[in-house]
Amino acid sequence: MLSILSSLLSLLFLFIISCFFITSHFWFPLSLPKILGFIKITSSRDDYDNEQRDEGTYVVGVEELQRELMPRHVAVIMDGNRRWAKRAGLLTSQGHEAGAKRLIEFSELCFKLGIHTVSAFAFSTENWGRHKIEVKCLMSLIQHYLKSKIQYFQREETRVSVIGNLTKIPESLLRTVQEIEEATRSYKKKHLILAIDYSGRLDILRACKSIVKKSEKGLIREEDVDEALIERELLTNCTEFPSPDLLIRTSGEQRISNFFLWQLAYTELFFSPVLWPDFDKDKLLEALVSYQRRERRFGCRV
């Protein structure tokens, strides 16, 4: 009886509210289709929220994440700094500065959520083809970023590794890289990897050449060559988890751009339309929820 009474009161309330919103006059007679239409809109809000959640546009919270399903390694292609600066009427260098700041916030949140390794594509081998002024700015920014954050990473007990072809970067940057790697080498729980002058193809090529040289010296035999050996020769051998569980790319581009070609074989991909400097906490949580809803089969049927 109480249930029926409650339902009748709810319908009466919806009737009165619908009168107010549709006509702004309680005494104006309403057609039944209008009333039913309003009731339908009101009752479908939960369905709409669920649809938004499925589409990845619903704002999610940390409570929606499951600790046991958290990725161990998250890689990110930080795309969109220049476009962000252009839209804001700023210099390209200011866009890259905003991107560097976002990386600190991004990695910090990842570590707080229990993610062990964060790797960021900071500068690709192909980026040398950009304007010399922008390249110089990027090298200077990376050096300043690393130099100014040494104490921060020590305080946070975060290991920092820089991978790539470091023979072409400025001497001052190389010294800073060596300094921060040495200062944070002993930390185990959190690991930030920066890829500078990195190419996935060249990483594999370098690993193959190293194996050939070791074979010529009699250090390894043909039967020793397997996937595990190749992985030990790749530049990501610096981490306990060389293969990312999740790759995030921002700015709407949907390609991996020669990043971690071997390592991404079974990585889950998340492409966001948001430009990197705007990729905030809510967007990261959105990516992680999307990841946790997927069924990872690694090529096998379950």
Swiss-Prot record:
Its cofactor is Mg(2+). This is Dehydrodolichyl diphosphate synthase 3. Its EC number is 2.5.1.-. Gene3D superfamilies: Decaprenyl diphosphate synthase-like. It comes from the Eukaryota. One of its GO terms (biological process) is response to cold. GO terms for molecular function: rubber cis-polyprenylcistransferase activity.
